[in-house]
């Protein structure tokens, strides 16, 4: 009956609140527990907080690094206070990200490269004051240049707009929007 369903729902909510409320009890914020390292012939893979790991690496020892940074404050990646993606805004994010760029510059051999996966980020009228796109890749390039790096090149990774539309439900990708008002249409957002 409906009364039984309501009672089960209420009990389930109570249990969920109790379980979530106790989630952090007994957990220590121990940065050491996130560190790990694997090696093979001519390669080393580090796992851990990138800034903390980079601090442990000797100067001028890395030939090539590749990674995807947090996309500013677009997603919450973890509950860690150390996570640079847990930022209130772009300024705070780039202040934190700058520490990594400095460390990577220190540990990278002169003339060698780092490859960064990123993409343009959506702007929302409620949060950003206007709807559109932020040039996140350009912001990364400018920040890296301010830390001593030289921009080498950009590779565009094409994304299927139909798949993006199905995933994001963005009206700017719909054919009916093109017919209705093409000024509000856009192509799929590439990665870089």
Predicted regions and their residues:
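A conserved SF2-helicase RecA2
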Residues: 1-25
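Core catalytic lobe of class I
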Residues: 24-192
């Amino acid at each position: 009956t409906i009364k039984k369903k309501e009672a089960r729902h209420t009990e389930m909510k109570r249990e969920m609140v109790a379980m979530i409320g106790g989630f952090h009890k007994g957990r220590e914020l121990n940065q050491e527990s996130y560190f790990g390292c694997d090696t093979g012939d001519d390669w080393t893979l580090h796992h851990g907080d990138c800034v903390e790991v980079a601090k442990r690496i000797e100067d001028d020892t890395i030939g090539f690094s590749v990674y995807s940074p947090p996309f500013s404050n677009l997603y919450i990646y973890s509950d860690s206070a150390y996570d640079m993606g847990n930022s209130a805004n772009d300024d705070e994010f780039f202040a934190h990200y700058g520490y990594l760029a400095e460390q990577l510059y220190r540990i990278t051999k002169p003339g060698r490269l780092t490859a960064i996966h990123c993409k343009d980020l959506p702007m929302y009228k409620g949060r950003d004051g206007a709807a559109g796109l932020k040039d996140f890749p350009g912001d990364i390039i400018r920040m890296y240049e301010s830390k001593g790096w030289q921009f080498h090149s950009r590779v565009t990774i094409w994304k299927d707009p139909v798949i993006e539309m199905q995933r994001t439900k963005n009206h700017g990708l719909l054919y009916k929007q093109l017919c209705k008002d093409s000024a509000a249409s856009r192509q799929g957002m590439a990665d870089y």
